[in-house]
């Protein structure tokens, strides 16, 4: 065969290889699907809580000067939003926490544009009414985390206007009282929490401009120290399992849990900020304490969104893609972890 023919064949092979479609490894699979937009204004730094099969989302910031007090109920069975009773106008805020305890929703702490807050409110689905409860005893703050387990609610970490915090408090709705509890992790704000099997997981966040990398689980059934440290979320160990942990660390992220996937029961962490606003998504396996990269969030890079989950389904709602009112989102996305990414289905 002549040198000319060899060159022609090699050139054709290079063209054919370069024209092959890009494929995503299985570890980067999963598909994002657009669902019904929030009926209210676009916003970021809103809160949400789940009661039964419904998600409740409200408060937040319009990117300019307005904090919201409105609240909305999402029914995933019919993919629709309906407005419920707003919080009092005086309770408008952003960067608060939302949680649920025994069929009631709670919202507390946050920022109203002028002051950091420590007030605490209860929502009753039966009366469609808000009632002010005992103020959060940890002091005014925003960008904290909150969750409910069993008969109690918990709020901790955050920023008080001067410093990042690491304290945690337990709320007893039957007595309307707060009790301080220990937390073994680092100070942080703009972290996330999620619940699985009556345990709370706290991860990500930032302190003094540094993204934190420690990861903790809270088990209220344990005696003594209820917190257990899990594997760090960066390339921290001398082993190889975390060599690819390039951008799990972040702030202002969203998280949710989906049970019964092909890979078991999983948590997902997506969006947020890591030097810039990002779209990367990671899967956490409760059984192995390991993370795997999944398909990027298909909306614009987003920060300050609400991650939530109803039975076997996970969602990300609202958030911002930049500065100003036009960058505030009213979108809702659902993540399908067992699906193959299709970038053309939205």
Feature annotation, model-predicted:
Residues 1-17:
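Sec-dependent bacterial lipoprotein signal peptides
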Residues 19-346:
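Kelch-like beta-propeller repeat domains
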């Amino acid at each position: 065969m002549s040198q000319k023919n060899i060159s022609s064949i090699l050139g054709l092979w290079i063209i054919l290889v370069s024209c092959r479609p890009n494929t995503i490894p299985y570890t980067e699979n999963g598909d994002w699907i657009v669902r019904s937009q929030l009926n209210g204004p676009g916003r970021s730094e809103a809160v949400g809580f789940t009661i039964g099969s419904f998600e409740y989302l409200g408060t937040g910031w319009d990117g300019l000067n307005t904090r919201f007090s409105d609240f909305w109920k999402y029914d995933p069975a019919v993919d629709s939003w309906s407005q419920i009773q707003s919080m009092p106008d005086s309770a408008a805020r952003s960067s608060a926490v939302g949680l649920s305890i025994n069929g009631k929703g709670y919202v507390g702490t946050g920022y109203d544009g002028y002051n950091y807050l420590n007030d605490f409110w209860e929502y009753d689905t039966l009366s469609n009414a808000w009632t002010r409860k005992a103020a959060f005893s940890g002091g005014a703050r925003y960008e904290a985390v909150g969750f409910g387990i069993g008969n109690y609610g918990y709020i901790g970490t955050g920023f008080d206007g001067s410093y990042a915090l690491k304290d945690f408090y337990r709320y007893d709705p039957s007595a309307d009282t707060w009790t301080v509890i220990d937390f073994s992790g680092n100070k942080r704000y703009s972290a996330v929490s999620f619940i699985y099997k009556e345990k709370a997981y706290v991860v990500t966040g930032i302190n003094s401009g540094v993204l934190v990398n420690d990861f903790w689980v809270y088990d209220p059934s344990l005696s003594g120290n209820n917190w257990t440290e899990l594997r760090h979320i960066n390339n921290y160990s001398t082993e190889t399992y975390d060599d690819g942990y390039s951008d799990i660390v972040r702030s202002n992220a969203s998280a949710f849990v989906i049970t019964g996937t092909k890979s078991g029961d999983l948590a997902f962490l997506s969006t947020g900020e890591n030097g810039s606003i990002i779209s990367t998504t990671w899967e956490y396996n409760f059984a192995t304490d390991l993370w795997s990269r999944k398909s990027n969030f298909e909306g614009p890079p987003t920060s300050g969104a609400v991650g939530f989950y109803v039975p076997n389904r996970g969602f990300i709602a609202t958030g911002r893609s930049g500065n100003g009112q036009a960058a505030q989102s009213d979108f809702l996305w659902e993540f399908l972890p067992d699906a193959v990414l299709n970038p053309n289905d939205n």
